[in-house]
Amino acid sequence: AKDLEQAFECYCKAAKQGNARAQNNLGVCYMKGNGVTKDLVQAVEWYERAAEQGLAAAQYTLGYCYKTGEGVEKDPKKAAMWCEKAAEQGIAVAQNSIGYCYDTGFGVEKDTSKAVFWYRKAAEQGNVGAQYKLGKCYYDGNGTEMNYSEAVKWYRKAAEQGDANAQNMFGYCYEYGEGVAKDLAKAAEWYRKSAEQGNATAQYTLAIFYKNGYGVTQNKAEAAKWYKKAAEQGDANAQNSLGYCYDHGEGVEKNSAKAVEWYERAAEQGNKFAQYNLGLCYEYGDGATKDLGRAAEWYRKSAEQGYAVAQYKLGRCYQYGDGIEHDCQKAVEWYRKSVEQGCAMAQCDLGNCYRQGHGVEKNLEKAVEWYRKSAEQGYDRGQFCLAGCYENGEGVPIDKEKALQWYKKAADQGFESAELAINNMQSSGVGTAVAAGAAAATVGLLWKILRG
């Protein structure tokens, strides 16, 4: 402490005589409380005196103070001005900072080409932050032409210096073969380096690699571990995935209550997948008290973000009045949104609406059209419904052979009602007139299945 006080006294004498370095050092003393009571206002005053004499270090620090409001009122324009003065004298950290100013329009008019100019100056001096940002500019085509090879070059330099963001992006380039030969093992290696430094995005991606065995030996427990690390940092995708792990006992002991807890965290951040999953939990009372109203509410949030399966579920809520007012027209509206994205379940239920005239004018031909779309995607209920139409001549001519073919496709997937329908047909003989009782039984099965 005594040495710091003596140094402070020496700096004071030299600073008052106009020595720029002493003025800067005096600013440091006041900023850190070295040998004197901490005083940010005094620090800024001395930095300014040194900066006005052209001392680059003081110019950069003064710019920082104007940026953060330490010892002076925030002033983005002055922050950028002093930062640029320091950058022009070759201070790498200042070059990186003024690059950021031009990149974002902080205190200056946004100019991404100038941002690239300054990032390059700093990057060539080895500034790791600038190397990463320059790589990102090349990757995104921001301020320069898109060039994955150049992006990889700068990502590599920053990654090898230990920058977690660069390590994550370098891994990403290896994963997708952008600017470098695709190599999932190397991608996993760089994701791990980034993840171990706490990068949530890399932690989430590394979890996916372990879940699916991409570039590493498949390990569900490791996947859950990395999902949890990312989830605890607030990554919504990881929170949803961790919820799924608890929901299905993947890599962790099955725990429906914990699944709901993580789904809720992600859902409240707007994650549409978690919103849908949470809706399922409330619909079936899995990990939470059954509540069809809350289920419908979460399905709606997900559906409004365009998630096709949630749109289908919301349509069913409207069609059957589950937790929401019964409204077949709204059901059809949501089914239509879902089928536009190719959802086989919604295609089948839209077919049901046309078959029964629920929310739309009854049209058996359109019913068959939607059943067929669903069936051709391999959806067992769509296959069953299409088979029923062929068996009974609803919207298509009676064709027992085709009916049997579609029933068999559904039955092969374990659809019990299809197996019963096959037995009814076979007991009467395929290709001949089916006994009235057998036909009636099949129609009855079809009607029951329409309700799901």
Language-model-derived ranges and their functions:
Residues 385, 415-430:
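TPR/TPR-like alpha-solenoid helical repeat scaffolds
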Residues 3, 11, 16-19, 32-34, ...:
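Short helix-capping/linker turns of helical repeat alpha-solenoids
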